[in-house]
């Protein structure tokens, strides 16, 4: 995390179907794993059916006409026109897992209702009216193949589609001669059945390419965190399906927006057990968090400048030379009642560990102290090394990962002084006070804004729960459309 000082760079705000990355190590293990269970696919299916149903209701049925011959009446002509789909009922749609192959959309026992106009002509004999067409037992089977393009973005295509119609029944009204149409209803029903049959799979294929593929493209490949860092969520390989879940293996790596440099480590293996009680689960490795620290460190923004103006008037301590009298009297005498500036930084990488007991790290910090002269120039005083232990609590909120850090007491070491040595213990209370009241709140302000998770547009997590495991966090949650 980066700390926003007053005149150092400041912090800024940080298809669904396959929710689910290029480092020096060319790591093939993911830093972030996203899985969707059958329960999650059921949610996806219901959401997808809304759009598919709209497309099916918009089926355009062309007018058709023909000749007929009836004994004793001779030849005549008929025409069916102004046809529109009034209803397309899909009672039990499913998206099934096809191990190693992808997904399968399955629709059975659907029904369609179509209305329109008809007319008949035989010499001077004319008749016309309305008709209702009932199509029962409509089934659709479509196989969906999931892949990834060179950029690591998910792709989805409809590889095969087949539809079947059990029965078609027509009912005419509006004329006493409607019985004529009923005499050759099989011909009409067969013609309409062929028309609908040809259009169903065309619509399914078009919905996948024109609706679903653009939607899954809203799954982020690169997610901006702030003006300093982004997260690489690119797919390392095509999504994998088993009989339990669909899995996307993502790079899961923070990088400095000024330079996407390599991280000198590889992600750990995450042993994630299947759990169908939630729609999705996400394995978030320690690699993910450590690349965040590395990116901010590479950008040289892990520092904060403190001056007295930033402290409250009733603060326990004030940053001026007066409080140095007890351990650096020479400084207090040479620079009476002048301001102090503290530059607190994290020059060394501190590896974050994830264990069943939680997330922890041992930061090594530094504080450089300066006297601020009336002309704003700085006189260096001393350099302190600071060691502490820290813990990190992580939660999920909506579409972000949020956190809060807790710091242990800092232990100080005098590394350098331009005005003689002194007992650093005399400074411990001051430094710990400033860390707890000025520095830590800024860190936690950033952590509360959080980091974006790899979710498609309009989808948030609900009922989320997080577990700490060895080297990774497991996030389980349900999905909600906003």
From Swiss-Prot:
Q: Taxonomically, which superkingdom?
A: Eukaryota
Q: Which UniProt keywords apply?
A: Antibiotic, Antimicrobial, Disulfide bond, Glycoprotein, Immunity, Innate immunity, Membrane, Secreted, Signal
Q: Which GO terms describe its molecular function?
A: lipid binding; lipopolysaccharide binding
Where would you find this protein in the cell? Secreted; Cytoplasmic granule membrane
Region (Central sheet, part 2), start-end ranges: 221-285
Annotated region Cleavage sites for elastase: the residues are 235-240
Task: Spell out the residue ranges making up region: N-terminal barrel.
Answer: 37-219
Which region ranges are annotated with the description Central sheet, part 3?
463-482
Where are the annotated segments for Central sheet, part 1? 28-38
Intrachain disulfide bonds: 161-201
What is the annotated role of this protein in its UniProt record? Answer: The cytotoxic action of BPI is limited to many species of Gram-negative bacteria; this specificity may be explained by a strong affinity of the very basic N-terminal half for the negatively charged lipopolysaccharides that are unique to the Gram-negative bacterial outer envelope.
Q: What is recorded about the domains?
A: The N-terminal region may be exposed to the interior of the granule, whereas the C-terminal portion may be embedded in the membrane. During phagocytosis and degranulation, proteases may be released and activated and cleave BPI at the junction of the N- and C-terminal portions of the molecule, providing controlled release of the N-terminal antibacterial fragment when bacteria are ingested. The N- and C-terminal barrels adopt an identical fold despite having only 13% of conserved residues.
Describe the subunit structure.
Answer: Monomer. Homodimer; disulfide-linked.
Name listed for the protein in its UniProt record: Bactericidal permeability-increasing protein
